[in-house]
Amino acid sequence: MVRISEDLIRRRAEHNNGEIFSLEELSLHQQDIQRIEHIHKWCRDLKILYLQNNLIPKIENVGRLKKLEYLNLALNNIEVIENLEGCESLQKLDLTVNFVGRLSSVETLKHNLHLKELYLVGNPCAEYQGYRQYVVATVPQLQSLDGKEISRAERIQALQELDAVRTRVLQQETKYLEEREKQKSNANEHPEINQSLSESQNGTQQYPESSSKTHTEAEDEEREFWEKPCPFTPESRLEAHRHLEEKRRANEKEKEKPKTKTPRTLITPDGRVLNVNEPKLDFSLFEDENNCLLLDLHVYRHMDSSLLDVDVQPMYVRVTVKGKVFQLVLPAEVKPDSSSAQRSQTTGHLLLILPLANEDVKPKKRTIRPTSVTSNQNNKKDTRAAPRRELLEVDPGLAGSLANIVPKGQESSHNPQRCGLEERPVSKDFVDDPEVPPLM
């Protein structure tokens, strides 16, 4: 059972900076609360209170909430409307889908002068014949019942038929209460339901541990529980809640169990080594001229080197990166005792230098030594002077001076010509004005 505590209210008062004494709106829905308590002492200024979808069997401890305007108690186990006379400012009361069968208890709401809206849909009393006329006539200040507005003509008619409707309602109420007593006696025959009901009211409800069952058996029991017909009573709702709570606790218990990881197969039973890359790192493997295999493993740049574990074997390499295994089969046998590992300070890559066990004799490459600058210049001069100079063959008869290129007598024809300026004729009607300055 969940009790209303100060910590619970403070967590629900985040919109009010965690202050509960000045709280005007409080939402405690779907908390499995089974009793209303402490709210009337800690939150005197409450105007809106949401308590829907809980397990509250009785309306209590709300009489001191003088400023309360809206109270939502839908989807609970309330059977009687009571203890609301002190809520002087109450304007809206929601009791949807409860177990209110004593409709005569609605007469206590006539003391709430500001009550305008009332919701009783989904209760056993809503099925009584003359239910609406009785409520409209008994609570004269109501303006809306079950979301439907009350007209003046409906109210007058209900007041005129109040005596007959009251007699009819009381008869149906008595019949329902007798059936309710039978339901309680039947519930007493089942000790599990009776125990869960008494424990829920006392706040000492305990949930048994789920036994180990197969998946098929659990599904069959779950289907049988929900498909089994049962009366709609507070006991059946508590039984459904207990079943859901057991299932939730069983799921939490399964989640809390440590999950054992299946070990990764690195070497098969026949001795074959497998390639494994659990950390999903990029790598490159190549051979240099010094008869060494170079393995460049792209380890994360900012990871500490203490989280790396390198194991070099003659035919494979195993690197453990933060508990994840990187294993690579080598193309040739190497010397583990002569191998070395280096870590780049810029990229963070891990370089493994693995000398080959069977070294191949390879020709050494010639190294070209750099020569001095003066020798290069002398060599260039020598190379230029050494080859023979090649010239074009020209007919000596065609040789002449540059002056003979253009024949004489044609010079004037090729000179640039100048265009002469033509003067425009002066008009006969032109009169010279001496005041106008000459054009420059």
UniProtKB/Swiss-Prot annotation:
Pfam families documented for this protein: CS_DNAAF11_C, LRR_9
Cytoplasm found in the keyword field: yes
Keyword set, alphabetical order: Cell projection, Cilium, Cytoplasm, Leucine-rich repeat, Repeat
Biased composition (Polar residues): 193-211, 369-378
Intracellular or extracellular location(s): Cytoplasm; Dynein axonemal particle; Cell projection, Cilium
Biological processes annotated in GO: axonemal dynein complex assembly; cerebrospinal fluid circulation; cilium assembly; cilium movement involved in cell motility; convergent extension involved in gastrulation; determination of left/right symmetry; dorsal/ventral pattern formation; embryonic heart tube morphogenesis
Domain LRRCT: 128-146
Domain CS positions: 276-374
Leader sequence residues: none
Record-level GO cellular component terms: cilium; cytoplasm; cytosol; dynein axonemal particle; extracellular region
Alphabetized PROSITE patterns for the sequence: LRR
Main localization (coarse): cytoplasm
LRR repeat ranges, renumbered to this chain: 20-43, 44-65, 66-89, 90-110
Tissue spec. comment: Expressed in kinocilia of hair cells.
Biased composition (Basic and acidic residues): 178-192, 236-259, 379-392, 420-431
Miscellaneous remark of the record: Mutants show development of polycystic kidney disease and left-right (LR) asymmetry defects.
Protein family: Belongs to the tilB family.
Function statement: Plays a crucial role in regulating cilia motility in pronephric tubules, cloaca and neural tube. Required for establishing left-right asymmetry of the body plan; controls cell fate and convergent extension (CE) movements during gastrulation, respectively, via the Wnt and the planar cell polarity (PCP) signaling pathways. Required for the proper development of renal glomeruli and tubules.
Subunit text: Interacts with dvl2. Interacts with kur.
Protein known as: Dynein axonemal assembly factor 11
Provenance organism: Danio rerio (Zebrafish)
